[in-house]
Amino acid sequence: MILLHIETSTNVCSVALSEDTNCLFSTSNAEGMNHAALLSVFIAEALEVLKSADKKLDAVAVSSGPGSYTGLRIGVSTAKGLCYGYGIPLISVSTLEILTVQALNIVTDKENVLFCPMIDARRMEVYAAFYNGKGIIQREIAADIITSDSYAEQLDKQTVYFFGNGSDKLKTTLTHPNARFIDHLVPLAINMIGFAEKAFTEKQFVDTAYFEPFYLKEFHTTAKKTTPNS
C-alpha cells in the first residue's frame, strides 16, 4: 500500500510518503504558519517521487488534531481534495499519537512509565492524554487546566514523560520528582506511517465528506451580557 501523510496541526508543516512500512519521502518546515504555501509544494514533491516509481496512491492520511484551526483546516481540506481527485479513502491520525511515537523511540526504559503528549490551548490550559510504554492509551484526551498539583494521581505512582508544545506550561509549574520532560518534540508526518498503515489494513477510513478535525477551542464560555431594564 502507498500512503500520503499530511501533518499540519501545529506550526510545523510536514508531508511523508510511504510504501507499507517504508518511508519513500519525508519533508517538514517549522518556520511558522506558512502551511498554505508550503503544503502544495511538499505534496507535489512527494507525488513526483510516486510518479518516477510508476506507482499509484492508495490513501491519504491526515492529522486529526487537536491543533491549530488554521493549520488543521489547510491540511484536512487538502487531504479531502486529494481523496476526491484520486478516488481514494481518507485516514485520520491523532496528533497526540504522532507525538507519542517519537517519545517512545527516545525513552529506552519504558517499564512502569507513562507518556503524556500535550498540545497548547490557551492561558494555562492544554489538551493531553496518557499512554503506557507500549503506546496503548491509558487515559483518553481531555482538556486540562495546569496547576502545581496537575497529574498528581499519575505522578505519585510512576514516572511520567511530558512532551509537545503544551508541556512548557507544565515545566514551569510542576516540581514533582517523577515528572520528566522531553523538549522540542513536534508532530511529523513520518511518524504517522505505522498508524495509517494499520488503519488502511483494517479499513478504518473516515467519511471524506463529513470528517472534521479536533480544532482547539476555548474551554470557558463567556457569560451572556444582560441588558439592564430601561
Regions found by a protein language model. Name each.
Residues M1-S64:
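N-terminal beta-alpha supersecondary unit
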Residues N22, N34, P89-P187, Y215, ...:
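Surface "functional belts" at beta-alpha junctions
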Residues A30-V41, Y69, R73, S77, ...:
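Residues at secondary-structure transition points
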Residues A46-L50, G85, A103, A189-F200:
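Stable alpha-helical structural segments in soluble proteins, enriched in small hydrophobic residues
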Residues A61-T95:
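DPxDG-like acidic metal-binding loop motif
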Residues I6-A30, K171, R180, H184, ...:
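Patatin-like phospholipase
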Residues I182-S230:
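Acyltransferase
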